[in-house]
Amino acid sequence: MAHNAQHLSKLLASSFKQAPPNTLPEVVISKIDGLVNWARTGSLWPMTFGLACCAVEMMQGYAARYDMDRFGVIPRASPRQSDCIIVAGTLTNKMAPALRKVYDQMPNPRYVVSMGSCANGGGYYHYSYSVVRGCDRIIPVDVYIPGCPPTAEAFVYGILQLQKKIGREQNLLTWWRK
């Protein structure tokens, strides 16, 4: 832990020495932005929205062999406590308003993971009259995990890709430049 603190202090010191005086606020804000994103990637609290067999693979990802807790991913039961929702399985027309309601109850910033071919595009039931052809028609999706059902390794990889995406965001810097 001390090594990480020393590395961070050296990185900050080198950034301040290289920055021209008029860009110093942008350097400070971008470093704060990076620190906030680092904290968000290390404490991702998803809400599981398991609708079919993909939810079983999602549960396996939280079990002892893959242990998503070591990545800081701890599932929550309430949408008000979570910052990510994992849609796993076949989304029907009757379930779509419930998904939208749960998504709207989540605080910002919020992220969506679509897990399995049924959640991605309807899957095996694509031509059924009662199936939504992809949950991205209801809510915006950040990461798609393919497969029928996707393996637990694919689930872990999808969560790691979401963490990379969160680490690249520049929310404060975009706000500052407005």
Curated annotation (Swiss-Prot):
| GO CC terms of this entry | mitochondrion; respiratory chain complex I
Per the UniProt entry, what is one GO biological process? electron transport coupled proton transport
Q: Which UniProt keywords apply?
A: 4Fe-4S, Electron transport, Iron, Iron-sulfur, Metal-binding, Mitochondrion, NAD, Oxidoreductase, Respiratory chain, Transit peptide, Transport, Ubiquinone
Q: Which domain of life is it from?
A: Eukaryota
Kindly report the protein's main subcellular placement as a broad class: mitochondrion
The family assignment reads: Belongs to the complex I 20 kDa subunit family.
Protein name per UniProt: NADH dehydrogenase [ubiquinone] iron-sulfur protein 7, mitochondrial
Taxonomic classification, please? Eukaryota, Amoebozoa, Evosea, Eumycetozoa, Dictyostelia
